[in-house]
Amino acid sequence: MMRIILFLLTNLAVVCVFGFILSFTKIPPESISGLLIFSSIFGFSGSIISLLMSKWIALKSVNGQVIYQPSNNTEQWLIDTINSQSKKMGIKTPTIAIYHAFDMNAFATGAYKNSALIAVSTGLLENMSYDEAEAVLAHEINHISNGDMVTMTLVQGIVNTFVIFISRIIAQFASSILSENREDNNSNRNTWVYIICSTILELIFGIFASIITMWFSRHREFYADAGSAKLVGRKKMISALQKLKLSYEPQEKSNIIAFCINGKHSSFLNLFMSHPSLDKRIQALYNRDYM
């Protein structure tokens, strides 16, 4: 319910901003309506399709192997732990997969809470204790329970719509100003002005949109850490994050890394990082932030 309320409030805020900006453009309302529909379709379609295909894409990206029947004690423990945590959180047990990677990592994805996927790297299973791995799994279960994949899709769709819509409104406004200031109304020139202007603006606004989506992504990591601490204990979650500091740099592809518990490590351009630093996440748990 809170996710839907947040979505509606965000949309309302976006519409208000649109209305304020458009009041200065003098562009006909019918053009605005068509452009808004166009922007919404293109803004949300890519995000929604990616969400619906996320499990298949994720498994293909990491060459993950779904566990249908456990072949060893570790796989049996993995299934039992995820089953237990899923019941506690009131969701169906996700599909469980293992993929080969030297880095310690795991991720959750899927369009629905009751039809999700959790994949765990061999590096994590080989290097973490059961307590630490349990905390990582609880982190991923909380992502699923919180509906984070859907929330990120909604956020991405909204900012995509905003980028497309505002870019084309400003480009259309610039093109109309140019045609008014020239005696010869060259339609080809105006069209090129519109295309070039809208393309440049989409690139610029796209950068700011990335900052917004990455801010949401970083905050959902804090909440998933806190949820894991509530489920299995703060000590286990802190220990897991400390162990991740010893991991190889994550090797997962860019379309997967945002879903992983262990994101890319960088001290440069933190605004564009999908994950907070491990030190900040550990400190947040010590301070009981987000709990």
UniProtKB/Swiss-Prot annotation:
Xref: Gene3D superfamilies: Metalloproteases ('zincins'), catalytic domain
Top enzyme class: hydrolase
InterPro entries: HtpX_protease, Pept_M48_protease_HtpX, Peptidase_M48
Cofactor entry: Zn(2+)
GO molecular function list: metalloendopeptidase activity; zinc ion binding
Biological processes per GO annotation: proteolysis
Keyword RNA-binding: no
Residue stretches in coiled coil: none
One Gene Ontology term, aspect cellular component: plasma membrane
EC number, UniProt record: 3.4.24.-
Entry's transmembrane regions: 4-24, 32-52, 158-178, 192-212
Locations listed in the record: Cell membrane
UniProt keyword annotations, A-Z: Cell membrane, Hydrolase, Membrane, Metal-binding, Metalloprotease, Protease, Transmembrane, Transmembrane helix, Zinc
Membrane topology term: Multi-pass membrane protein
CC cofactor note: Binds 1 zinc ion per subunit.
Binding, Zn(2+): 139, 143, 221
Record: active site: 140
Principal location listed in the UniProt entry: membrane
Membership in a protein family: Belongs to the peptidase M48B family.
HAMAP family xref list: Pept_M48_protease_HtpX (MF_00188)
Protein name, entry field: Protease HtpX
